[in-house]
Amino acid sequence: MEQGLVVTQLDVQPGECVKVKGKILSDAKGFSVNVGKDSSTLMLHFNPRFDCHGDVNTVVCNSKEDGTWGEEDRKADFPFQQGDKVEICISFDAAEVKVKVPEVEFEFPNRLGMEKIQYLAVEGDFKVKAIKFS
């Protein structure tokens, strides 16, 4: 996927929210929002796929530790439409990561037990309009 926005040296604590607002491209194949320590250590890889990597209208979540991907977790809900404007809110605690989008909340285990988010990256067919930390 094409590298997009990358933010480093963050200090997002448990219970705080990372909000990413933007627009899904009208011909989107997929995009991802990654949070964690750095590009090789991710608490969450959140990857809505319209039509890529053999998946159609599927949200794939995963973690990455020292450059090695964990087991993919495919979600049944797919609340995204090509061309839509969307706000994605990511929060976490010691046990899990929550991703809130309009109409759906996704949950994924905090497999690495990470205690803060230091890194955010948005890749693929998504145009970032705003980022907010709260």
From Swiss-Prot:
Mainly in the liver (adult), mainly in the muscle (embryo). Residues 4-134 form the Galectin domain. Gene3D superfamilies: 2.60.120.200. InterPro entries: ConA-like_dom_sf (IPR013320), Galectin-like (IPR044156), Galectin_CRD (IPR001079). Keywords: Acetylation, Lectin. One of its GO terms (cellular component) is extracellular space. A beta-D-galactoside binds at W69, G70, E71, E72, D73, R74, K75. SUPFAM superfamilies: Concanavalin A-like lectins/glucanases. One of its GO terms (molecular function) is lactose binding. It holds the Pfam family Gal-bind_lectin. The modification N-acetylmethionine is found at M1. PANTHER family: GALECTIN, GALECTIN-1. This protein binds beta-galactoside. Its physiological function is not yet known. It may be involved in the regulation of differentiation. Homodimer. This is 16 kDa beta-galactoside-binding lectin. The lineage of its organism: Eukaryota, Metazoa, Chordata, Craniata, Vertebrata.
